[in-house]
Amino acid sequence: MTDSMADSKTDSKTDDMTGATAPLVQLERYTRFWNTGPDGDRDRLAATVFTDEVEYRALVGLLRGPAALADFRDRFVSHAGPATVRRREEPEVHHGRARLRWEILTGDGTSFATGTDVIEFAGDGRISGIAAFLDRAPEGFDPTAHD
């Protein structure tokens, strides 16, 4: 992280006026959520990252609530094996939204897929909505199989 980024208001832990968690902090937690299995501290992490009504919209469908996102992650890992989500670049944030470009790496470090999440923040700084787009789909992925 550059010094200028460390000094920016968006990198502080909370907004002094509202007490809301800063977007870049939440995006770091968001990435950590996708990399935390059921044996980790995922429920506590989810409560700090997501609103109770968070909506996740992707080609695979519409998911509602942190438990549905955790289940989606667990089903993916049970099917594909160990996987890690990493950010491809620094997220862009403005007007209560963020664009986060990600990559999923398999257990051996092979790139599985890349994508972009457009994330909406609630007034308290937690994530209330995610629209997930595939930039490079996994090999053999059929987008019509999830209609």
Regions found by a protein language model. Give the residues of each.
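A beta-strand edge to alpha-helix "cap/lid" segment located at domain peripheries
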Residues: 2-3, 15-18, 77-147
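Short acidic-aromatic low-complexity motifs
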Residues: 17-49
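A solvent-exposed, acidic/Ser-Thr-rich amphipathic alpha-helical stretch
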Residues: 24, 43-96
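Hydrophobic alpha-helical core bundles mediating ligand binding, dimerization, or RNAP-core interactions
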Residues: 27-34, 50, 73-76, 100-102, ...
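Hydrophobic pocket/interface hotspot
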Residues: 30, 45-46, 54, 65, ...
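Short, flexible active-site loop motifs that bind/organize anionic cofactors or intermediates
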Residues: 36, 59, 117
